[in-house]
Amino acid sequence: LVFKQKMGIFMRCYQRELQRNPELKGKVVVRFVVGADGSVPHAHLRATSLENNVVESCVVDEVSRTRFPRPDGDGSVVVSYPFNFGPL
């Protein structure tokens, strides 16, 4: 639900580069930690088939800025999330 609300931001990362390369498409998998307070202290690129550093960095940066609901319990949660990009 959190990413659904921010999907427009993630798509802007992609759309800017799509103008330069109309064939640009692929998947970006970001691995990140949701801390006990809902912040994201760590996020990094786990895998990609997009092979576009600008989009990949933008997506990782936006994930890092995202606030999530606090995880159950007192700990943190590790998540791997795939973002699929392709021309509409």
Q: What are the residue ranges of the model-derived segments?
A:
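Charge-biased low-complexity segments
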Residues: 1-88
